[in-house]
Amino acid sequence: MTYLPSPRDVPIHKLFLVVILTALALTASSLGHTQARKDREFRECPDCPVMVGIPAGTFLMGSPKNEQGRFDSEGPQRVVSIKAFALGKYDITTAQFIDFLKSTGHRPMPCNRILGFAWGSPGRGLELQLPNWPAVCLEWIDAEAYVAWLNAKVHKERPALAPGPGPYRLPSEAEWEYAARAGTKTARWWGEAIGRNRANCNGCGSPWDDRLFATVESFAPNPFGLYGMLGNAWQWTEDCWHPNYIHAPDDGRAWTEKNCAKHVIRGGSWNSLPVLVRSASRSISTSDGGDYDNSSLTGFRVARDLP
């Protein structure tokens, strides 16, 4: 892992040169994958998320018509090009999100008013979750607020960064699937079948099956070195919801419209059936809360632009 004890002294283009070069080397050789993954990791400040450099490439997005459990929203399949970027090694954790709440005073909306699930709820707030669980009970706007705070934090520690938005953001839906597949073409990065103890879902054969969240390091990482891309907690993407991929961009950017109220979530959660725990599976959640919605099972991880 690349740690930066003095961020102000490291030019940003040099910081990511090693990330990009080692990512390219990873695609050219099957030797030393574990070390190559570690070489692509970086963290821009002591309490910033650990990021993993993802190599540029093309992939077939969506599911084939014969994939077991396929939904029409996962097609038509198409070739998508992805620029090199970085993605969080883990979901943002409860501890990381609490740091954000304490720093900003941000108050997420309740995600289940019937059961009283909310951040800051006396006696039963989400702050009581384990610190290394994925932070959940979050709407898309909460994830965006965290990203804005993280960008302000990094800009403060790195004044040489170009002015303007970024570099952190939510991943596009295409980036998310590309990273989840990690070069594989099967329904899940480990194969077609759900197997046993590969992820946390309702039928994944793990100790947490349909019971509760697992910690973010509970299962093996995928070939890109990313943990928990499938199962445990849904993850927000930048994209607005569309019922299929007709007219979708093929350059990896997010497919958005101004003020859309519905956004795409990916990956499945601890109570999802295996059919939803596939690389191509996608679902929908609103940005305006409600008595009960998917946000009670939804968190996020951050992406980062690379020069």
Write out the residue ranges for each language-model feature.
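N-terminal secretory signal peptides that target proteins for export/translocation
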Residues: 1-13
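Bacterial N-terminal signal peptides
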Residues: 18-27
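Boundary at the C-terminal end of the N-terminal hydrophobic targeting segment
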Residues: 32-36
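N-terminal pre-domain segments of enzymes
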Residues: 37-43
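A short glycine-rich, aromatic-capped structural motif
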Residues: 43-116, 136-142, 231
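Residues embedded in well-ordered beta-strands
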Residues: 52, 79, 187, 235, ...
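Functional-site microenvironments in short loops/helix caps that host divalent-cation chemistry
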Residues: 60, 64-69, 117-286, 291
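Short, structured beta-strand segments at or near domain termini in extracellular proteins/domains
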Residues: 294-307
